[in-house]
UniProtKB/Swiss-Prot annotation:
Lineage: Bacteria, Bacillati, Bacillota, Bacilli, Lactobacillales
Gene transcribed to yield this protein: atpE
Protein name from the UniProt record: ATP synthase subunit c
PANTHER family (alphabetical): ATP SYNTHASE LIPID-BINDING PROTEIN, MITOCHONDRIAL, ATPASE PROTEIN 9
HAMAP family per the UniProt record, alphabetical: ATP_synth_c_bact
CDD domains named among the record's database cross-references: ATP-synt_Fo_c_ATPE
Length: 71
């Protein structure tokens, strides 16, 4: 049962992060197309946003490992 819970935790985190990264990058590219002179600042902000979104699957993996190796 712990393995199923771990798999669901990782799956949910991966799907959510994939969707979130897609939205962040999509909106950044859209903004760069509207204002090319802001592309440097937008790119920096995008990388920060992607890093924050990627924290979710990392936490999902940690929770999954706790579920699998819990006594």
């Amino acid at each position: 049962m712990n393995y199923i819970a771990a798999a669901i935790a990782i799956m949910g985190a991966a799907i959510g992060a994939g969707y979130g990264n897609g939205q962040v990058i999509s909106k950044t590219i859209e903004s760069m197309a509207r204002q090319p002179e802001m592309s440097g600042q937008l790119r920096t902000t995008m990388f920060i946003g992607v890093a924050l979104v990627e924290a979710v699957p990392i936490l999902g993996v940690v929770i999954a490992l706790i579920l699998v190796f819990a006594v």
